[in-house]
């Protein structure tokens, strides 16, 4: 858990006091004694694959190619290429089936 100093905004550290643990600021004299167990869990919402690829709008102006869909075997697919790793590695090609009823997505 990360708490911030209300006086200067810096991160507080946990240190051992005389009677209890406490949150203390290294920059200013702010100290907050811990009198009970402090727990707080936050689970971040994971991004959808579409969010990473620019959402539905990213597929509006892409070209199609003769790549068969592995799900419905439609003969064509839309594609776009993105650099997902290091610059010295090849780009990743993302495909979306041209069949509107299928819409399957995969990468190469």
Swiss-Prot record:
It comes from Bos taurus. A zinc finger (TFIIS-type) spans 65-107. It is found in: Nucleus. One of its GO terms (cellular component) is RNA polymerase III complex. SUPFAM superfamilies: Zinc beta-ribbon (SSF57783). InterPro entries: DNA-dir_RNA_pol-M_15_CS (IPR019761), Rpa12/Rpb9/Rpc10/TFS (IPR012164), Zn_ribbon_RPB9 (IPR001529), Zn_ribbon_RPC11_C (IPR034014), Znf_TFIIS (IPR001222). Belongs to the archaeal RpoM/eukaryotic RPA12/RPB9/RPC11 RNA polymerase family. Signal peptide: none annotated. This is DNA-directed RNA polymerase III subunit RPC10. Transmembrane segments: none annotated. Keywords: Antiviral defense, DNA-directed RNA polymerase, Immunity, Innate immunity, Metal-binding, Nucleus, Transcription, Zinc, Zinc-finger. Its main location: nucleus. GO terms for biological process: defense response to virus; innate immune response; termination of RNA polymerase III transcription. GO terms for molecular function: DNA-directed RNA polymerase activity; nucleic acid binding; zinc ion binding. The TFIIS-type zinc-binding beta-ribbon domain contains an acidic hairpin motif (residues Asp-88, Glu-89) that likely coordinates the nucleophilic water and magnesium to cleave the scissile phosphodiester bond and release the mis-incorporated 5'-ribonucleotides.
